[in-house]
Regions:
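N-terminal pre-domain/capping segments
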Residues: 1-93, 161, 271-284
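Short, flexible loop/turn segments with low-complexity composition
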Residues: 202-203, 253-254, 281-284
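C-terminal/domain-terminus segments
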Residues: 247-277
Length: 284
């Protein structure tokens, strides 16, 4: 069964302000029983506290995050064993790459080189029961020499699975439901992130009256990240498709909440998912 949990990037400032244990408590209080760890340093102390908080509050860690390379050395190219062992300590069956380093996107050859590095790390994780995934943004749907960047990555990294982010799929010009079905059993994880168009707020119009048109123009031509059910995406169809293709885990993510408390945003997404009939996926 597919589970629906919370994505830690949404709570990155809360982890910093409140600490790991209290943040987990608040996530559990909303009703989530699953989380993906992101934007949180995987130091030994943090891993130990995450494990304890997961047990105490009944929120399973179903995915963690690791970069391809990192200055602190905790990366897939520098310490794949350490990345895998941290995931194992947390009971996490998946590790995901949020994005390749910017230099990797220079051309098809650099994209393939980064993908091959990820592919080389995948068996190290697999030996320890952990699956490596790659998370998309919109840029992975750009074409290089006629091929989509995402397809170049997948061809060069056959041992790496996908974490498909439906907001970025839509922003990249594709239909999320069709894209989920297209990649099918290559999809292990899904990010449930809605897509919102919003009129300029009062502050933007105050700036306009003061002679600064920038905020109004930005809003008129911009896109927002939205709570599930508060945007334009067909989230019911998206979740049903994730279940249909057998994706084990989905996570509610909102990169920015525009002044709304992050826990309130996650709670609103939770309520909408309940209203759509997905209580079992949230409580599993």
């Amino acid at each position: 069964m597919t589970t629906i949990g919370a994505q830690g990037f949404t709570l990155r400032t809360r982890f910093a302000e409140l600490g790991i244990t209290e943040t987990f408590r608040r996530v559990a209080e909303i009703g989530y029983r699953s989380i993906e760890i992101s934007a949180l340093a995987m130091t030994p102390d943090n891993v130990a506290e995450i494990a304890a908080a997961s047990t105490e509050h009944g929120v399973a860690v179903n995915a963690t995050s690791a970069p391809l390379t990192a200055e602190d050395g905790h990366s897939l190219t520098q310490d794949a064993v350490g990345v895998a062992e941290a995931a194992v300590k947390l009971g996490s069956p998946f590790v995901r790459i949020g994005m390749f380093p910017p230099a990797a996107y220079e051309n098809a050859d650099t994209i393939r080189a980064a993908a091959r590095q990820a592919n080389a790390a995948a068996p190290v994780l697999a030996e320890r029961g952990v699956t490596l995934c790659f998370h998309n943004h919109a840029i992975e749907f750009a074409r290089v020499g006629g091929d989509r960047v995402l397809d170049i990555i997948l061809d060069a990294a056959p041992l790496v699975q996908l974490e498909l982010d439906v907001h970025w799929i839509h922003r990249g010009g594709l239909d999320p439901v069709r894209t989920l079905r297209h990649y099918g059993d290559r999809v292990a994880l899904v990010h449930l992130k809605d897509y919102r168009l919003a009129l300029p707020n009062a502050e933007a119009y105050e700036a306009l009256r003061a002679g600064d048109p920038g905020p109004v123009r930005e809003a008129l031509f911009g896109v927002q990240f939205a709570e599930v059910g508060e945007g334009t995406l067909d989230m019911e169809a998206i979740v049903r498709t994730a279940v249909e293709i057998g994706a084990p885990h989905a996570f509610v993510e909102q990169d920015a909440t525009y002044g709304v408390d992050e826990f309130d945003a996650l709670a609103l997404s939770y309520r909408h998912l309940v209203d759509l009939g997905f209580t079992d996926l949230l409580r599993h």
